[in-house]
Amino acid sequence: MGAILGKKIGMTRLYNDKREAISCTVIQAGPCFVTQVKSAEKDGYDAYQIGIGERDEKKINKPMQGHYRKAGVTPGFMMAEFKKTEFSENLEAGNPVSVESFKEGEKVNVLGVSKGKGFAGVVKRHNFGGGSRTHGQSDRLRAPGSVGGSSDPSRTFRGTRMAGRMGGDNITVKNLEIVKIMPESNLLVIKGAVPGPKNSYVKIVSIKK
């Protein structure tokens, strides 16, 4: 049981004992360190703040330099918080967090930000069918149709599906299986797809039994 931060490297495939191809995502989960321990007495809640990667100290501002220095760790690229209950052991600031806290075959949830698609119409964003392709139609092919009545109700209802910014949402993909663990290179190979583009950061959390 554990939790860790990771960087999405890309997708590949592995073959199981039956010679079946399995689509997998490779995640660089480390080096990770505890940068802060939060407690209910001081902060109002219990959590571990985890940082990932090693970054040049000159490329971060002074407050963040002090924050990393206090923990006694090298500055990282990103930090995220995890509940203490997601770890099977007590950690202190500066302790490493390794992929060895997971096991092959274990099920995890992966949290990330989905790919941003920019401003999208209703056909792409909500899978609308669009207008009829015949009977004199000239410019209604990908139009949304009516979005509110005339005199009644004289307004557009809140939540009506319309064109707008698509993607860039917080997504959790559940029950993904860890196919392979490579501790020497801090790699996790997870069955299936995880949210976000290449080189984006994700949170990997064990499923509580």
Curated annotation (Swiss-Prot):
Highest taxon in the source lineage: Bacteria
Gene Ontology molecular function terms on file: rRNA binding; structural constituent of ribosome
Keyword terms, alphabetized: Ribonucleoprotein, Ribosomal protein, RNA-binding, rRNA-binding
Keyword Nucleotide-binding: no
PANTHER family attached to this UniProt entry: 50S RIBOSOMAL PROTEIN L3, LARGE RIBOSOMAL SUBUNIT PROTEIN UL3C
Subunit: Part of the 50S ribosomal subunit. Forms a cluster with proteins L14 and L19.
Protein family: Belongs to the universal ribosomal protein uL3 family.
Protein's name according to its UniProt entry: Large ribosomal subunit protein uL3
Organism: Chlorobium limicola (strain DSM 245 / NBRC 103803 / 6330)
Upper taxonomic lineage: Bacteria, Pseudomonadati, Chlorobiota, Chlorobiia, Chlorobiales
